[in-house]
Amino acid sequence: MRKLYCVLLLSAFEFTYMINFGRGQNYWEHPYQNSNVYHPINEHREHPKEYQYPLHQEHTYQQEDSGEDENTLQHAYPIDHEGAEPAPQEQNLFSSIEIVERSNYMGNPWTEYMAKYDIEEVHGSGIRVDLGEDAEVAGTQYRLPSGKCPVFGKGIIIENSNTTFLKPVATGNQDLKDGGFAFPPTEPLISPMTLNGMRDFYKNNEYVKNLDELTLCSRHAGNMNPDKDENSNYKYPAVYDDKDKKCHILYIAAQENNGPRYCNKDESKRNSMFCFRPAKDKSFQNYTYLSKNVVDNWEKVCPRKNLENAKFGLWVDGNCEDIPHVNEFSANDLFECNKLVFELSASDQPKQYEQHLTDYEKIKEGFKNKNASMIKSAFLPTGAFKADRYKSHGKGYNWGNYNRKTHKCEIFNVKPTCLINNSSYIATTALSHPIEVENNFPCSLYKNEIMKEIERESKRIKLNDNDDEGNKKIIAPRIFISDDKDSLKCPCDPEMVSNSTCRFFVCKCVERRAEVTSNNEVVVKEEYKDEYADIPEHKPTYDNMKIIIASSAAVAVLATILMVYLYKRKGNAEKYDKMDQPQDYGKSTSRNDEMLDPEASFWGEEKRASHTTPVLMEKPYY
């Protein structure tokens, strides 16, 4: 049996090797290791010519700005490079033993770095107004915040009122406008709770005790179950005050209510529904708005600080280019620009409302006539009752570039794919902190990626492509900017980029195969479309990689099963004998999503703040 096992195991390894490396097949048909897409090479056809920026003709930026960019084409992928010929023009600048060819793969060296700025992906919900999820409480559907990233500097402004939204909601005989949005006082106190208080409260909870302060605050708010419904997945949002180190649970999930039909701005009418809106205000700089879904690794995957000496751009075949079509506003400083971006960012606020009796009118009538059914049928936020439940999924004008010299804020809704090194700019997002900045532009990114790609190709071609005279072939990637001009393998003398703190050089004499359209979309130029005709327009197919992974996994599983069967038969037999003794196995572990005690809401048998809804529909009395 052991011989059989060895034979099968060796066969499995050989099968795996054949799948991944092949026996004489064309190596360019297989993906790179640790890369989603293999970077094959096509015949080099890029003869030096006078450099032209491939941006749309309506682009108005100065040439020196464009030269500092590094952008990538995300939807143009490699094709076969069999029969690639060296470019004579490129050989002249290098030693006689080097033959330089240019890859046709338009990859993006910024992909990993820029992942956190793909807000639709990393946040996945509204920013200005976040109501991206629905949840049921006691048989009624509600909307609630669901963004996966913290929103720094976000708060709620109550119109024509000195009441802060972090004040507890009105209870008992208080007028509506005497209260804010936060949880009412409880015994023991659950909101606001200090950071040290939360640490102490969850010190024995392995899942929570070591979380950072923002994630801990989010989980603490999610510990409260509305309306004694332990099966509900409704979780309250929260705001963390970084200055006071306190976590405030928000009793009201609504973030916007404006217009005469829905609220009354008259301060004298204290018991009417108040108007409010989300904002990034000076007084909110220490606040961070949190949903129940904030990920515990947000520091790695979400943007926080603004990027100094940088502006967002689009990767366009080897260089990062300006985004040609933006909305430009005046802004005195970074804070004002960040505030403008936030105001235009993704929003889940409903766009349609009932034609007759509105939600807020129902609420007011319910209070006035003590009609509990009217209160129960209504629901914050505005328009959620018989109205559209619009979800932005994070799509909006979420990015901006602030020019410190011209005091202009350039806002756009296309996902940036790279950064331009420019000493005049600060790159910001709607999620980012309104004033915090970091200055650590990755100047060596291009050089490192160029060297990595050249080394990767060299390993693949090995000695097979060396000619009889011992000349060495170099496959240069399509990266035409670097802080090391020799690494560019440029057929002409690279030019230094102006306003660059990294001292970048750009190669302008290699023809670019992509350009930016009028809607900020990067596309392959018309004359090169035939070469990329068989390549998917937006994303590469990963069928081959999936087959390889699945086959390798199957072989590994087979080998593991054989090993277990041959060497642990006796141990397994003993375990099978115990199957009739369930008492020996103990209790099952609880689910992670039930890790917090639902009774920790501290309400006990006392009357809750609301018996009908997770948000303010009737005044609780204590």
From Swiss-Prot:
One annotated Gene Ontology cellular component of this protein: membrane
Q: Which InterPro entries match?
A: Apmem_Ag1 (IPR003298), Apmem_Ag1_dom_sf (IPR024056)
SUPFAM superfamilies named among the record's database cross-references: Apical membrane antigen 1 (SSF82910)
Which domain of life does the protein's organism represent? Eukaryota
Cystine pairs annotated here are 149-302, 217-247, 263-275, 320-418, 337-409, 443-502, 490-507, 492-509
List all annotated glycosylation positions. 162, 286, 371, 421-422, 499
Q: Which residues form a coiled coil?
A: none
Q: Does the keyword Zinc apply?
A: no
Q: Which SMART domains match?
A: AMA-1 (SM00815)
Transmembrane segments annotated in the record for this chain: 547-567
Record's signal peptide: 1-24
Sorted keywords for this record are: Disulfide bond, Glycoprotein, Malaria, Membrane, Signal, Transmembrane, Transmembrane helix
**Bilayer topology annotation:** Single-pass type I membrane protein
A Pfam family that this protein carries is AMA-1
**Which compartment or compartments is the protein found in?**
Membrane
Q: Which residues lie on this side of the membrane: Cytoplasmic?
A: 568-622
Tell me which parts of the chain lie in the Extracellular compartment.
Answer: 25-546
Q: Which residues lie within the region annotated Disordered?
A: 577-607
What family name appears in the similarity comment? Answer: Belongs to the apicomplexan parasites AMA1 family.
Function, as annotated, reads:
Involved in parasite invasion of erythrocytes.
Name of the featured protein: Apical membrane antigen 1
The protein's organism comes out as Plasmodium falciparum (isolate Camp / Malaysia)
